[in-house]
Amino acid sequence: MRLSQMLFVTLRDDPSDAEIPSHKLLLRAGYIRRIGSGIYAYLPLMWRVLQKVSQIVREEMNATGAQECLLPQLQPSELWKESGRWDTYTKAEGIMFSLIDRREQQLGLGPTHEEVITAIARDMIRSYRQLPLHLYQLQTKFRDEIRPRFGLMRGREFIMKDGYSFHVDEDSLKKTYQDMYQAYSNMLRRAGLAFRPVEADSGAIGGSGSTEFMVLAEAGEDEVLYTDDGKYAANVEKAVSLPADAEPSQFTTFEKRETPGTETIEKVTQFLKASPTQIVKNVLYQTAYDNGVTVLVLVIIRGDQEVNEVKLQNELTKLAANYGAKAIISLTVPSAENQQTWTAKPLPLGYIAPNIADEYIAANKQIHPKFVRFVDKTVVDLKNFITGANEAGCHVVGANWGEQFPLPEIVVDVRKARPGDRAVHDSTQLLKSARGIEVGHIFQLGTKYSQALGATYTNEQGEEKPLVMGCYGVGVSRLAQSAVEQSYDKDGIIWPVAIAPYHAIVTIPNINDAQQVEIAEKLYTELNQSGVETLLDDRNERAGVKFKDADLIGIPYRIVTGRAITNGKVEIVERATRQSQEIPIDEVITTLQQWIRAAIEQKN
């Protein structure tokens, strides 16, 4: 392709609304154009990158025996109501775009396709002889992000590969899950990315287990906790660890103490000259379920620890059926205004005890009349601890479970693991932190969707059983931008060879020099014919402008038909290393073929 004929416009300055380097560079280099909040056009160079990423994804998926298909983007609400996810995805902070058609039918623009694929399986799979089965698609997805940001990293419209597998049992699912683990590792390795698979929370997708594939980058939205021995890595939302040991309490007798102005852990520790590990703090939440019921939640946790709200939401989801609900709409720390809607009398905020009376909750048919009390494992073995006295300005010291306070029945792990904690698998290993960009996520769904939608098969004994499912997603457009976030310098993008829009760019420093033009044209034609995808910069611009643009757009090899041609050579500059060599003109094709092959094979 000739740059003189391409839609090619670069910017010298960073766009004001771009926050991270990859977003700035893709805009500056003319790869993408912002059309609206979280909505981008993929321009010719970007489309070539996306096609290459998609091809790698296809090849790895096809190698596992998965079959490509294409599912509808418009999805009837009835399917989502069958699964119980319609309200979760369309109300409050839900991410589904929903609409009503001219026949007054509710529809959603697909953020994911579990419901659709399960409905297809329900209609078409009858026997164990048809299993296992794995279908996938590459398609545009839509998500109504609360805060679209970072370009293609968190957009409202994006390209994704999503796959769904169906099995007779968990053993069959686990085999496909492992196949996908390997396929995803292959995809990212072939694309030239440094990544780390990590244990992850399954979120709204659900299921018994999942793995995220994180591209390591400082601008990543996710925090990954890992150990140096390589035996543990997890998203902080999922991570577990051993907290520091609690310090012995200096209080041996139970008594109430006046502690005015000590509403925070820091203040009460200073006032009582105690360690936060001796404190039982009681954190109040309110959760709204999809049937309109609000439940008040008390999380009882050690004073030096933080609540992991993802873990907490998972525990509350397990209780949904107790309240006649299927899913959680929201989980918040109630503001003073919110508290007024359900409190019968003012709460002693900052001084709440584990046994705060249910009478604080006003009678209201939409409000559950009792607190749900979760006790975190960090406080179960505490002795002679400090906690609130249910009275403003007062705490109790020297308290014990089974004496002054009953130990709540629901014991959970809802603490947030953090760097420096000891690892569960080896207490000599300390957790370390890294930032990552989630580009892939694989799930063991089990029978969550098949049971909800009645998708069954007949086994060898003639019994009807629910299909066992897995699902597997890769953000194609996010992966492409992640490559930029991981590989750039002050002058521009440095594309991995395997996904670069072109392998090489032939730059003519002076288009008025007939010899430069002739050699450039010949190389351009022959390189493309030999399989080296090549751009020709034949624009009527100064050489310096062309060199800067070549660096900015990140083509792996720049061929310059400059002064070296008088010696029968051209200059080749490798973008990644800046190394420059003069190569005889008749050796350019074989040299580049070797370099490109070596760069790609190194990642395979």
From Swiss-Prot:
Source organism: Nostoc sp. (strain PCC 7120 / SAG 25.82 / UTEX 2576)
Cell cycle found in the keyword field: no
Subunit (UniProt): Homodimer.
Assigned protein family: Belongs to the class-II aminoacyl-tRNA synthetase family. ProS type 1 subfamily.
One of the GO BP terms on file: prolyl-tRNA aminoacylation
Subcellular location: Cytoplasm
Primary localisation category: cytoplasm
Protein name listed in UniProt: Proline--tRNA ligase
CDD domains on file: ProRS-INS (cd04334), ProRS_anticodon_short (cd00861), ProRS_core_prok (cd00779)
InterPro entries: aa-tRNA-synt_IIb, aa-tRNA-synth_II, aa-tRNA-synth_II/BPL/LPL, Anticodon-bd, Anticodon-bd_dom_sf, Pro-tRNA-ligase_IIa, Pro-tRNA-synth_IIa_bac-type, Pro-tRNA-Synthase_IIa_type1
EC number in record: 6.1.1.15
Free-text function comment from the UniProt entry: Catalyzes the attachment of proline to tRNA(Pro) in a two-step reaction: proline is first activated by ATP to form Pro-AMP and then transferred to the acceptor end of tRNA(Pro). As ProRS can inadvertently accommodate and process non-cognate amino acids such as alanine and cysteine, to avoid such errors it has two additional distinct editing activities against alanine. One activity is designated as 'pretransfer' editing and involves the tRNA(Pro)-independent hydrolysis of activated Ala-AMP.
GO MF annotations, alphabetized: aminoacyl-tRNA deacylase activity; ATP binding; proline-tRNA ligase activity
Main EC class the enzyme belongs to: ligase
Catalyzed reactions per annotation: tRNA(Pro) + L-proline + ATP = L-prolyl-tRNA(Pro) + AMP + diphosphate
Protein keywords: Aminoacyl-tRNA synthetase, ATP-binding, Cytoplasm, Ligase, Nucleotide-binding, Protein biosynthesis
Domain characteristics, as noted in the entry: Consists of three domains: the N-terminal catalytic domain, the editing domain and the C-terminal anticodon-binding domain.
GO cellular component: cytosol
